[in-house]
Design a protein with these regions (language model features):
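Short alpha-helical "recognition helix" segments of helix-turn-helix
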Residues: 116-124, 131
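Short, mixed-charge low-complexity intrinsically disordered segments
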Residues: 62-81
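DNA-contacting interfaces and partner/effector-binding or oligomerization modules
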Residues: 1-66
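DNA major-groove recognition helix of helix-turn-helix
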Residues: 111, 124, 135-136
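Major-groove recognition helix of helix-turn-helix-like DNA-binding domains
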Residues: 129-137
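Short, Lys/Arg-enriched anionic-surface-contact patches
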Residues: 79-105
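Short basic helix-loop element that most often maps to the first helix and adjoining turn
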Residues: 6, 107-116
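Generic anion/oxyanion-binding catalytic loop in active/binding sites
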Residues: 35-36, 96, 109
Length: 137
């Protein structure tokens, strides 16, 4: 299995899909590939278009091809920023889970010490109904 770098840019209403590894590729019959670019109308089509293009030029099965896609729009490194956003969302999810666990634990401890449910809600910044749910969970 071979991994190809795929560089995607925007050109008017099209996504230009460049596969630098295909420039000058020599086929089994000696033909030289002169182009490294195809296009896609939608970003969701890029992976499939790139793999189809690579398979057509190299005459290999799609199962033998992997692609590493980078997207750049007028100097915006879309790939890097999207990865950063995904990472931050994952961190936020973990922090939210930890905060939920800590809130539940604190609510239970306060309730065991006789603190009123409404006061537990005030401490945690939630309604008394939510405080009761945390205590009961």
């Amino acid at each position: 299995m071979r991994t190809y770098q795929v560089n995607v840019t925007r050109d008017d209403r099209w996504w230009m899909v460049a596969v630098p590894g295909l420039t000058g590729y020599v086929t089994s019959d000696g033909a030289i590939n002169m182009s490294d670019t195809t296009q896609a109308r939608r970003l969701s089509e890029v992976r499939r278009q790139a793999i189809d293009f690579i398979c057509t030029v190299t005459d290999v099965a799609p199962s033998e091809v992997q692609v590493n896609i980078t997207i750049d729009v007028d100097g915006i490194d879309v790939t890097a920023e999207a990865k950063k956003i995904a990472h931050n969302r994952e961190l936020a999810k973990r922090h939210a889970t930890a905060a939920q666990t800590e809130a539940r634990d604190l609510a239970r401890r306060l309730a065991k010490h006789g603190v009123a449910v409404r006061d537990v809600g005030d401490v945690l910044g939630v309604s008394f109904q939510r405080a009761q749910q945390l205590i009961s969970a």
